[in-house]
Regions:
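Active-site core of glycosidic bond-cleaving carbohydrate-active enzymes
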Residues: 1-42, 51, 95-271, 308
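Primarily short, surface-exposed interaction patches in extracytoplasmic proteins
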Residues: 1-4, 12-16, 39-59, 66, ...
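Short Gly/Pro-enriched turn/cap motifs at secondary-structure boundaries
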Residues: 22, 90, 153-154, 288-291
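Acidic/histidine-rich catalytic neighborhood
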Residues: 58-111
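Short acidic-glycine loop/turn motifs at beta-strand connectors
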Residues: 71-72, 302-305
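A glycine-rich phosphate-binding loop feature that marks nucleotide/adenosyl-phosphate handling sites
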Residues: 80-81, 125-130, 242, 275-282
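Catalytic cores of secreted or luminal carbohydrate-active enzymes
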Residues: 247-299, 303
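C-terminal beta-sandwich/jelly-roll accessory domains of carbohydrate-active enzymes
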Residues: 304-338
Length: 338
């Protein structure tokens, strides 16, 4: 299905993005991030990524440019949404918009840095990124937007995109970890979670997996599968519907599948993480031929709470860095350089 998505993005993204209301540009940037990640997992080289991603990113940035405002040495976003809070109201400096623009700028810059190429707007991208408004926060963590705290329970974690899936704020930085922990707990507990739906539980599982908290990630996935999930119904075949069965929602079971694999393997910040968030009771577990950024397929086995072996194959011959807990040495058993 990745190829179908890639083809669809190539065919319709430019025309769609040029016709939308600027307040919705974050949605299309998120779609572009999925497209970019597909290329990264497929092992595309940076020249190919630049060729395929940059034209679409430039179209998206042109829309952001319409709602950028410079004030007191800071770039701000005006009138942008934070799905699906308060019925798609528009806000200034929504965390959803700021994270989307930040990812877009960082990707444009990286594509040119990695290919040693230039662009007339390169300096401007860097200047906007450097002076972009900080993510609005309060005592409960990340807010919806500037002057708009998260005060109502709702299903979407759109205000947390800087953590996941964009991974702009890394949890190995202590202040980032504290911010994410506080933000997740507030989002899930607000009004006893009355606005949560299936997507909330799968998203929370991914956020906890990003923190390396396998127990809480598993707890959220188990709730999704076994307990009431608000307006949602999970069917035995993993098909998922909302609104008393009227609305099929394919992204939720796909999100659940992603959450499950993220307990076993994650690849971000140029590092492949093996068993980064397994719950304590998964003493014995294994996975086979899961993909990682850079065109790698990875298999591994864990027994009695310890990783026994890891098998990694590079489809493109690119180097990689692996993070394993509990190993003080690595022994290569294969004769080939893979």
């Amino acid at each position: 299905q990745g190829k179908n998505f890639q083809r669809l993005m190539d065919e319709v993204f430019p025309s769609l993005v040029r016709s939308i209301e600027p307040c919705k540009i974050g949605d299309y940037t998120w779609a572009l991030q999925n497209y970019y990640m597909y290329l990264r997992y497929a092992g595309a080289d940076w020249q190919d990524i630049k060729q395929q991603v940059v034209p679409k990113a430039l179209d998206a940035f042109a829309v952001f440019d319409k709602i950028l405002c410079y004030k007191e040495n800071t770039w701000h976003l005006t009138h942008i949404e934070s799905p699906e809070y308060e019925g798609f109201q528009k806000y200034n400096d929504s965390n959803y918009g700021l994270a989307s623009l930040s990812w877009l700028l960082q990707t444009l810059i990286a594509c040119h840095d990695r290919t040693s190429s230039t662009h007339p707007d390169y300096a401007r991208w860097k200047e906007i990124l450097t002076r972009l408004a900080p993510y609005p926060t309060n005592e409960n963590g990340l807010m919806i937007a500037a002057n708009k705290p998260l005060e109502k329970s709702h299903r979407h974690y759109s205000h947390l995109l800087a953590f996941y899936p964009f991974r702009l704020l890394h949890p190995d930085v202590p202040e980032n970890r504290k911010l994410l922990e506080k933000s997740i707990e507030h989002w899930l507990s607000l009004e006893d979670g009355k606005g949560l739906a299936g997507y909330s539980y799968t998203g929370a599982a991914s956020l906890y997996a990003y923190l390396g908290n396998g127990n809480k990630a598993y707890e959220r996935l188990a709730h999704f599968i076994n307990k009431p999930i608000g307006i949602s119904i999970l069917l035995p075949n993993t098909f998922y519907v909302e609104s008393q069965g009227k609305n099929p929602v394919i992204e939720t079971p796909l999100s659940a599948a992603a959450s499950l694999t993220e307990l076993l393997i994650q690849s971000w910040d140029e590092t492949i993480r093996i068993f980064p968030a397994v719950p304590d009771h998964w003493k014995d577990c294994a996975f086979h031929a899961l993909r990682a950024e850079g065109g790698f397929t990875v298999s591994a086995q864990r027994q009695d709470g310890r990783t026994e072996w890891v098998s990694l194959t590079s489809e493109k011959g690119q180097p990689c860095r692996i993070q394993l807990s509990g190993w003080d040495a690595v022994h290569q058993l294969s004769a080939e350089r893979t």
